[in-house]
Structures are given as C-alpha cells and as structure tokens.
UniProtKB/Swiss-Prot annotation:
Organism ancestry: Eukaryota, Metazoa, Chordata, Craniata, Vertebrata
Tissue specificity field: Major protein of plasma HDL, also found in chylomicrons.
Subunit relationships: Homodimer. Interacts with APOA1BP and CLU. Component of a sperm activating protein complex (SPAP), consisting of APOA1, an immunoglobulin heavy chain, an immunoglobulin light chain and albumin. Interacts with NDRG1. Interacts with SCGB3A2. Interacts with NAXE and YJEFN3.
Gene for this chain: APOA1
Cellular compartments annotated: Secreted
Protein name: Apolipoprotein A-I
Function in brief: Participates in the reverse transport of cholesterol from tissues to the liver for excretion by promoting cholesterol efflux from tissues and by acting as a cofactor for the lecithin cholesterol acyltransferase (LCAT). As part of the SPAP complex, activates spermatozoa motility.
GO molecular function: amyloid-beta binding; apolipoprotein A-I receptor binding; chemorepellent activity; cholesterol binding; cholesterol transfer activity; enzyme binding; heat shock protein binding; high-density lipoprotein particle binding
Keywords of this entry: Cholesterol metabolism, Glycoprotein, HDL, Lipid metabolism, Lipid transport, Lipoprotein, Oxidation, Palmitate, Phosphoprotein, Repeat, Secreted, Signal, Steroid metabolism, Sterol metabolism, Transport
Sequence repeats: 68-89, 90-111, 112-122, 123-144, 145-166, 167-188, 189-210, 211-232, 233-243, 244-267
Domain of life: Eukaryota
Amino acid sequence: MKAAVLTLAVLFLTGSQARHFWQQDEPPQSPWDRVKDLATVYVDVLKDSGRDYVSQFEGSTLGKQLNLKLLDNWDSVTSTFSKLREQLGPVTQEFWDNLEKETEGLRQEMSKDLEEVKAKVQPYLDDFQKKWQEEMELYRQKVEPLRAELQEGARQKLHELQEKLSPLGEEMRDRARAHVDALRTHLAPYSDELRQRLAARLEALKENGGARLAEYHAKATEHLSTLSEKAKPALEDLRQGLLPVLESFKVSFLSALEEYTKKLNTQ
C-alpha cells in the first residue's frame, strides 16, 4: 500500500516531465500550478454554467411559481467559495512544496530515466516525422493534377475524379498505418524498459530502503494532517457564509410549498 501511494505521488510529481518528454512543448508547470490552474478553470466554468442554469430555472414556469430567488443569493455563494479558495491557497501550496521536497531525490532519478529513454527513442520519432512529411508531399503531388483537372473539367467529370481520388486516399491511409505500426513496434521495447526501470526503482526502495519508504509515508501523512487542520477555519467560514443562503432558500421553499398547498385545497 505504501509503495502504491508513493508511486502515485512520484508519477504525479514527475508527470510534467513525462508530458514534456513526449510532446516536446513548453517547459513543464509545477504540480501545484497544474492543480491550481485546473481548479480555477473548473470553478470558473461551474460558476458560469451554474448561474446560467439558475437563471433558466427561475425563468421557467415552475421557477416563477416557487419564487425561490436563487439568483439573488448566487453572487453571495460564489463569493463565499472564492474566499475559501483564497484562504486554502497558501495552505495547499505549503503541502505541495513539502511533498516535492520529500520526493526530490526519487523524482530526480525518474527524470534521469526519462531522459535516457528519450535519447534512445528520439531517432525513431524523427524518422517517423520525416516519413510522414514525405508521404504528405507525395500525396500532394499525386492529387495536384487531379485538382487542376477538376478546375478545368466540367461537372460530369466530378464522379470520375472522385473515383481517381478514392484509391489515392486508401493508399495514403495504408501507408500511414504502416508507418504508425512500425513506430509502435520500435517504441514498444523502450516503453517496457521505462516501466521496468520504474518497477526496479520502487522495488529497490522497498527492499533496501524500507525505512526511507516508511519515512515518506509518515511525512506525507503528517502533511495531510496539517493540511486538514489548517483548512478547518476556512471550511468553518464557508459553513457560516452559506447558512444565511440556505436559511433563505428554506424559507422561500416552504412559503412556496404552503402557497401551492392552499391553491390545491381551494380547487
């Protein structure tokens, strides 16, 4: 169980390096930056879409009958959640900083493994890219005369042109599939090698560094406990901030329910 927890932590903390290895794009973000960005986007989308849904509900026949005034309280609710996010920000940042610090050595070893495998597979990736560009250029050269023929020909030649293009498209698809299969075959041993290296690292850590692994687990547990304790005041503020909103909702709902019951009794 400890090994599984540590594996997840290491893979998450080295995830940006792995992504950078395969995609070769912009420099990786820190784990906390990725979590923070994801949470911000999620909360913003939830806030915007939630407001739209509430607005649509209040505009419906049922919403008008209930008259719950949910939209009036929406800004208060979103403000409360934004405040909670701001309060938990430094606490969560501290947690990730501590976790990164404790696993720095193991992450460096994993990064070294990734770089070594990257150096081995890079020629295959470059070769695949080169062949793909050559195939696209070959396809363009074959299609170009047909495009000119279409521009110069009449409408009745369109079907004939489509028949000529069909085998070219199938040929292109088959050749591309062959290159992809070849690349997959070349990369398979290195993927296995990387997986075996990770397993070996963790096995060695478990066998020769049991105390170190237990220390990782103990420190992670300690950091989580600290995070929980520091989050309690912010969560209590959230509860206190939501109480008036929930009370207002309850009063509005009961009032609407009572009015609806009276209407049923008078019918």
